[in-house]
Amino acid sequence: MVEPFEIPTEWIKFRAMDWGQAKPYACLWFAVDYDGNLYCYRELYGWGGKANIGTGETAREVGEKICKLEKRSEKVQGGVLDNACWARTGVTAPTIEEELDAVLIKHKLIPFRKCSKGRIEGANAFKQRLIGNEMKDGSFKPAIYFFKTCYHSIRTIPMIGHDKHNPELPDTTAEDHCYDAVAYACSSRPFSPMRAKMKRDSYDCYRTEKKRSAWTY
């Protein structure tokens, strides 16, 4: 967790969303710094005041809430959304994605795109960022951070365990909506851990002995 700060205008910003009606929905906003680290700086969590209980809001109602939080001047470069939102439940009824994006487009915001990765890939992408990059002292520095104002992300993500039947996956019976949104975000921004670069002594091309410095005698 980090204290909120003013995000530089040059950083890339995007959103990631896990849809829910009977259960909560989670829309999270992320910024990408110059080193590729992710900062979750805002959340919109649709819960009914009790753990894992949704609000029953329609996709259009939720879309309007997203637009109230996200301004055009913020220059959010679209977002990733749960694949299931593209499923059509009736012959003529619009999909969740169509309803959400219709509102975003009306407000001149960039719509969502489909998250193309599966749950295992998303879980691994999140795990890699939690481990992060190796430092010179052998420790590791995470590549993802959460503003302290992201209450529900901080409340729910640490409580999620492993699936009883597949330890590669999170427990889907838990309140995993913020977790899923983070997994979509991590999948959309591939991360390659960097090993610490240790300072090396300079060597001559033809000799194994150290080069003599101009300041040594």
Where are these regions (language model features)?
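ATPase catalytic-site recognition across NTP-hydrolyzing enzymes
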Residues: 1-19
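Accessory terminal regions of nucleic-acid processing enzymes
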Residues: 2-3, 187, 208-212
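Residue-level detector of short, conserved catalytic/binding motifs and their immediate flanks
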Residues: 13, 25, 77, 179
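Short, flexible loop/turn elements at secondary-structure junctions
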Residues: 19-21, 83
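Catalytic-loop motifs flanking and including active-site residues across diverse enzymes
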Residues: 23, 96, 177-181
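Short beta-strand scaffold segments in enzyme catalytic cores
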Residues: 25-31
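Mg2+-dependent endonuclease catalytic cores in nucleic-acid-processing enzymes, primarily RNase H-like
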Residues: 34-171, 190-193, 204-205, 213-217
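Acidic, Mg2+-coordinating catalytic module of metal-dependent nucleases/exonucleases
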Residues: 169-198
